[in-house]
Each structure stands twice: as C-alpha cells, then as structure tokens.
Amino acid sequence: MAVIAIGLDVVEVARARGLLERHHDRILDRTLTPEERLYVDSLGDPAPAFAARLAAKEAVFKALQVFDGARTIGWRDIGVRRLGDGRPEAVLLGHAAAVVSRRDLTLHLSLSHSRDVAAAVAILEDAPRLGVS
C-alpha cells in the first residue's frame, strides 16, 4: 500500500470543555454521530474524549482533501468508534462515504490526549496493485 494523504489535528481540551459548558446539546448534536454522542455522554468528564473526536474528524477531513468534493464533508460525515481492543476506527458516512466511493482505501487513525490537549493523525492508503509487492 502507498500513503496518499496524511491529516493531523490538535485540540485543546479546555476549548472543548468550554464548548460543552456553553453549548452542550447543540454542539454535540452538530458534531457527533449518535454512537459518538452516547459514548461521550457516558463519561464522567467528557471533554478529553470530545476533544479527541474533534481532532480525529478534522485529521480525517484533512486527509480526504486529496479527493474532489471533499471540501463539503461535514462533522457528522466522519465518525469515530472504538474497536474491541480499544483502538479507534474512523467511519465514513454520508458525503464522506460518497467522496471515496468505489475506491479501495485503508484509513488509519491514531488518537491521544492528555489533560491539556487531544491529538489525532489520519493516514490514508490506497490498495496494493496486483502483482506489485
């Protein structure tokens, strides 16, 4: 596989906390999928997880900019879910899924957060070509 795009984003947890304090329901409904909302709302302190999801969505959005039509991808067109082993996985929905349709791609996502910041890296790879190793 060959890397075709990388996206990176960092979000301050304090900024995410402020958004939650001022606009909790509105900001969560606008930015998160229903599955993400359930997860974030289940946490005692949702700000770090919310910040990580914002960073992830922005990192994936940046990686997808190599495709025509990607500029209009919305917050809820990119989801983040946790796999059984705890790793994050990006899920492309709606317009994001349409932008990459009929392409054989792998999207890797890594998230990290501390008390102060959340960061995400998205790496987009194309499928290996037949007969090429």
Describe the residue ranges of each PLM region.
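Core catalytic alpha/beta fold that binds nucleotide/phospho-ligands
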Residues: 1-133
